[in-house]
Amino acid sequence: MSKRESAKHKIDRRLGENIWGRPKSPVNRREYGPGQHGQRRKGKLSDFGVQLRAKQKLKGFYGDISEKQFRKTYEEAARRKGDTGENLIGLLESRLDAVVYRAKFVPTIFAARQFINHGHVNVNGRRVNIQSYRLKVGDVVEVREKSKQLAIVLEAVQLAERDVPDYIDVDHNKMVATYNRVPGLSDVPYAVQMEPNLVVEFYSR
């Protein structure tokens, strides 16, 4: 099992949910967490526990980004006008790694981060190797020419388990995606329920 596959399985088991909707998720086979004590019945979570779980789930979905980076994103969402939870989703979905994943250029969010790190992606014609790079509406993301025939790319395009959301236009023949608009929670095709309002409550304590 690769390190990326192990990380995905660990997050799913820890949360007890198949947060990416993957057929091979370990939680499809069992209903308890990792470790020798994973089979013990879980008690009812406190309000804090529910809020913490919501944060862990959202943070985990985007590749288990660091607490420092996630909190920084939340604080930016809180400073903006409008609903903080909706702003948070919009900021997370405008990350370059999220758009590369949503566009089906790679099979997983973890693969997206590595793909970007290795210099396989251009934004508006220039190479960008920063996972958290913030896209603006109208930005064009393209797989670099020499990378278009990589097995990981060809495999991802064929994945039937997820569709490209309508806030991203994709041409898989050219391997080009345009970020059309900032989505709200209802626009994002999460495989499980995400509750950014609980994340706001967590950080507002």
From Swiss-Prot:
The keyword Zinc-finger does not apply. Belongs to the universal ribosomal protein uS4 family. Keywords: Ribonucleoprotein, Ribosomal protein, RNA-binding, rRNA-binding. GO terms for cellular component: small ribosomal subunit. One of the primary rRNA binding proteins, it binds directly to 16S rRNA where it nucleates assembly of the body of the 30S subunit. With S5 and S12 plays an important role in translational accuracy. Part of the 30S ribosomal subunit. Contacts protein S5. The interaction surface between S4 and S5 is involved in control of translational fidelity. GO terms for molecular function: rRNA binding; structural constituent of ribosome. InterPro entries: Ribosomal_uS4, Ribosomal_uS4_bac-type, Ribosomal_uS4_CS, Ribosomal_uS4_N, S4_RNA-bd, S4_RNA-bd_sf. GO terms for biological process: ribosomal small subunit biogenesis; translation. It comes from the Bacteria. Pfam families: Ribosomal_S4, S4. Residues 1-16 have a biased composition (Basic and acidic residues). Residues 1-46 are annotated as: Disordered. Residues 94-157 form the S4 RNA-binding domain. This is Small ribosomal subunit protein uS4. Transmembrane segments: none annotated.
